[in-house]
Design a protein with these regions (language model features):
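Ligand-site clamp/hinge motif
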Residues: 211-257, 375, 384
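Ligand/substrate-recognition segments at binding pockets and active sites
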Residues: 201, 252, 325, 343, ...
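Extracytoplasmic/peripheral linker and loop segments enriched in polar/acidic and small residues
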Residues: 384-396, 401, 421-490, 512
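Surface-exposed binding/hinge segments that line
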Residues: 88, 132-176, 198
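Structural transition elements
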Residues: 314-348, 366-369
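N-terminal lobe/hinge region of extracytoplasmic solute-binding protein
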Residues: 40-91, 121, 187-190
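Alpha-helical secondary-structure segments
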Residues: 112-119, 146-152, 192-193, 220-223, ...
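Gly/Pro-rich hinge or "lid" segments in bacterial periplasmic/extracellular proteins
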Residues: 73-74, 78, 165-219, 223, ...
Length: 512
């Protein structure tokens, strides 16, 4: 079935369910006085430990439980105070962090300098940490006061404040880590407005209000309950019927259909989220740059955007969208759609009769449809792709940990600081570099160079170089930037999207 045919089918299903469930929605939405945000979530978390999880989709569940040391502005991603009241570079190799007083973890333990030091050392050195590269420039973490920590650096690193606005800055109770050990991923204890109740894998994650939260009045919600619904049409039905009252990662077809419904508010916002294919270039045949280049030339990104995003997205040529201050727009010229060029590159690489490749991907309907479009485009260039599908957590483990397959069709969800994207995707020791190969030492250096400066023009020059090196080496297949499309019941108030495209529920309330 073509992308256009899939779109029409999807739209018809959505319109039908609106008509069928509208009356049920009105009855269900009037029930209960507790403010419970019930979220239809498309993916089961890979883990509830922010330092050991490998899926960008985990953030939506992690944010309510784990505050970060540094916050960020939702529109600009510029850093702002969080668990830290302030931070400053005492000198180019010393970053001083001042911790907000009076904060406790959900288990009653105090957030102090020792707790922060413990967490940052865990990120840097724990065997289970998948984000070690984020703090690669840190030589030592020292508690230099009861509420002060100083990071001693190997070299200047201007990206650290925004690195601490992501997973590396999510603080976990040291007591809980010591108590639960490897089971801490199922027993999360943070400092956020919501504390953990239960996680039934592939079914639900339930959180309840943390009464001793340090930001009084920040949330009016009594609870957040995530129901794992991988089929997005079923997820829409759950919101229209009143079973849930919030859904994210809607398809563009559903946005068009639901925009005419009075039963749900639908919003669209641009984001850093991109659909990508990761390559294992540590093994044949993708260790040959010509094969990787051929795959890139075989994809018609404009047609892909129309088929999968109905034109609401933007063709992706690099990690950053064209509107981002650090985007190198020249990279868009590297891989124009050219089937004959793709075939020629394969022939040069010794595959004149084409090539068979084994990829993996998720098993939900949306992902399978995306895989079908990729298969059809690659076939025209004599690239015969076969996908093995499964749940997100399974696919993530099989490809990135167990090294199975030539590549995986997934996503890159972006990070507040652009340099982190390049480090996490392509660094030799990164979790996302399945082959654990350093194709380009110059790329590694360019990323490090981008962190030496605070001036944006100097940072951009280094990041421009990084993007060129990624393109020249065809280190992955960027496909399309996906807009954040969300929907919620009219009673849900105060939701604001962010540029990362990962929903946060700060300030959300539910009217009666």
């Amino acid at each position: 079935m073509t992308g256009q045919g899939l779109a029409h089918l999807d739209r018809r299903r959505v319109l039908a369910l609106i008509a069928a469930t509208a009356s049920t929605f009105r009855a269900a939405s009037a029930q209960g006085s507790r403010q419970v945000l019930r979220v239809s979530a498309p993916y089961n978390p890979s883990t509830l430990d922010p330092h050991t999880g490998g899926a960008g989709s985990d953030h939506v569940v992690l944010y309510p439980m784990f505050d970060t040391l540094v916050g960020f502005d939702p529109e600009t991603l510029q850093p702002k105070p969080g668990l830290l009241t302030a931070w400053k570079y005492a000198d180019p190799l010393s970053l001083v962090l001042d911790i907000r007083p009076g904060i406790t973890f959900h288990d009653g333990e105090a957030l102090d300098a020792e707790a922060v030091r413990f967490n940052l050392e865990r990120v840097r050195a724990d065997a289970r940490s998948v984000i070690k590269t984020e703090l690669a420039t840190v030589a030592a973490v020292e508690a230099t006061g009861p509420l002060q920590v100083t990071l001693r650096l190997k070299q200047p690193d201007s990206a650290l404040p925004l690195i601490l606005a992501d997973r590396a800055g999510m603080m976990v109770s040291p007591k809980a880590i010591k108590q639960f050990g490897p089971d801490s991923d199922r027993n999360p204890v943070g400092t956020g407005p919501m504390k953990f109740v239960s996680w039934a894998a592939n079914e639900s994650v339930k959180l309840t209000r943390f009464e001793n939260y340090w930001q009084k009045g920040q949330t009016q919600l009594d609870a957040i309950e995530f129901t794992i619904i991988t089929d997005v049409v079923t997820g829409v039905r759950s919101v229209v019927s009143g079973q849930n009252n919030f859904i994210y990662q809607l398809r563009p077809t559903q946005q068009q259909a639901l925009s005419r419904s009075k039963e749900m508010h639908v919003g669209v916002a641009q984001s850093l989220y991109s659909v990508v294919m990761y390559f294992n270039y540590g093994r044949p045949p993708l260790d040959d740059v010509r094969v990787r280049m051929a795959i890139n030339h075989a994809i018609d990104r404009e047609a892909f955007n129309k088929a999968i995003m109905m034109g609401l997205g933007a063709p992706a040529h690099t990690v950053l969208p064209a509107s981002h201050w650090a985007c190198n727009k020249d990279v868009a010229t590297y891989y124009k759609y050219d089937v004959e060029r793709a075939k020629a590159l394969l022939a040069e690489a010794g595959h004149k009769d084409g090539i068979d490749l084994e990829f993996s991907g998720y098993s939900d309907q949306r992902s399978v449809q995306t895989q079908e479009v990729v298969i059809a485009m690659l076939r025209k260039a004599n690239i015969r792709a076969k996908f093995t599908t499964g749940a997100l957590a399974v696919v993530t483990t099989e490809y990135f940990t167990n090294k199975k397959g030539d590549g995986t069709l997934a996503a890159w969800t972006g990070r507040p600081d652009p340099s982190v994207s390049f480090a996490l995707m392509f660094n030799k020791e990164s979790f996302l570099n399945a082959g654990k190969v350093e194709i380009s030492p110059e790329l590694t250096q360019a990323v490090l160079d981008s962190r030496k400066y605070t001036e944006l023009d100097k940072r951009k020059a280094a990041l421009d170089r990084a993007q060129i090196l990624v393109a020249e080496n065809a280190l992955y297949l960027p496909l399309v930037f996906q807009p954040e499309i969300f929907g919620h019941a009219p009673q849900v108030k105060g939701y604001k999207s962010n540029l990362l495209g990962k929903p946060r529920f700060d300030g959300v309330s539910i009217s009666s």
